[in-house]
Amino acid sequence: MAKSIRKRVITVQYISLFVSIILFASSCAVQKAQRSLLNTPALKGAHVGIAVYNDTKGAWIDQHQSDYYYTPASNTKILATYVGLQFLGDSIPGWKMAENADTLFLFPQGDPSFLHPEFSYQPVVDLIQKTNKQVVIATTQSNDRFESMGDGWAWNDYAEDYQPERSRMPVYGNVVHFYDNGKSLQIKPFHFFKNQDIQYEAVKAKQWSRKKSTNDFFVTTQKNSAKYFQVPFVTNPEKDIQLLNDSLHIAKPIQVLKYSPQLAQRTIKTVPTDSLLKIMMSRSDNFYAEQVVLLGSAQLLGRIDDATFMDSLIKTEFNFLPQPMRWADGSGLSRYNLNTPENYVAILKQMQAKFGESRVKNIFEKGGEGTLSAYYKNFPGTLYAKTGTLGGQIALSGFIYTKRQQKLYFSVLVANHMSKTTSAVRKAVEAYLVEIAKRN
């Protein structure tokens, strides 16, 4: 009997020792992977924040400067995704409407899909074209508090396709769409070019731009062989109605609403929320992210006031964060945004718990797709993540399902790197995460 007990004790001791050796080896491997990342030549002089959490085991795997602040760039779109899932329902609450005997009143709420070529479903366009009533649109609301450009944006990027203006009533995505088929140049909307005589041979394979404060478009000396490209236009509530009339060609021209009628309003839902968020995350669409935040503000506050909306969410929806964050816009274009790796891990955990694992997975991009198309193709498991890039800043936050059935949340934020190419930094982060996934 005593011999049997001693045998069991020895067996337990051996098992404990074996487990300890495995854990020690795993810990050493993680530390080695971390050192390899931090010592990468592309990251010389940079600041790197790392947070990796094993949700299956409920334990941190790796942390390095994980409570330090970084400019997260497009990782800010993770917050915009949270807003969309929390406030926008199954389909975008893009408009409100009311009507009386002879007039249809429309109240835009910031829907980015309106007349956007990417979306064939256009319920508001159908409504406008089918009604016999006079259509009037409230293009502004007196208690709105937001600017066409986000706080901290680069002012001289006004003509870049990644920085369209924000508005209560976006039209065509607030950009001019150029289609070059090799024989002709199609422009949509053509509203801004009606007085121009555009000869294709003179503009073929050329880049277009515009003046800073007006919709005066012109061809630059820069080459552009793209078959499709965009240039943002200057939004203006009343002039956008002219653009709308020029596009829809309805019998009774749309008018601007000068007063708010005392009539019951109902919501017009447009495109599926998850479809919009999926596109936003896949190509890191700044315009969609900004408009999602404006839509969220309209839903929660009854007005578009992005600063008040984001401040309110920091105190309520995001009061669980380990560190207080600074949130300046929806897209991450602003360098005023500040966040930590630990915060992103906490946000990702909360999103899956609150909105469902499968729903969140369907919105995030997998390795080898979208902005991750050049990375994580042969990953030991499955990685879902959001990238982020600004000058000197690189970000990647997401979650991993390893081959050993472990779920990991991670965030790697890099500040002030001086690498000539972002790919060198991204490959170093990829090598690190590959090692982490192999060991878990």
Question: Where on the chain are the PLM-derived regions?
Answer:
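Short alpha-helical patches at coil-to-helix transitions and adjacent helical residues
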Residues: 75-78, 238-241, 285-289, 337-341, ...
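Bacterial Sec-dependent N-terminal signal peptides
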Residues: 1-37
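Beta-lactamase-like hydrolase cores
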Residues: 28-69, 88-91, 127-134
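Active/ligand-binding-proximal structured segments within catalytic/core domains
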Residues: 71-84
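Conserved serine DD-peptidase/penicillin-binding transpeptidase domain
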Residues: 86-323, 438-439
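Short glycine-rich loop/turn motifs
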Residues: 47-50, 277, 289, 311, ...
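Short beta-strand scaffold segments in enzyme catalytic cores
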Residues: 50-52, 95-98, 397-398
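Small-residue-rich helix-loop
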Residues: 61-63, 293-440
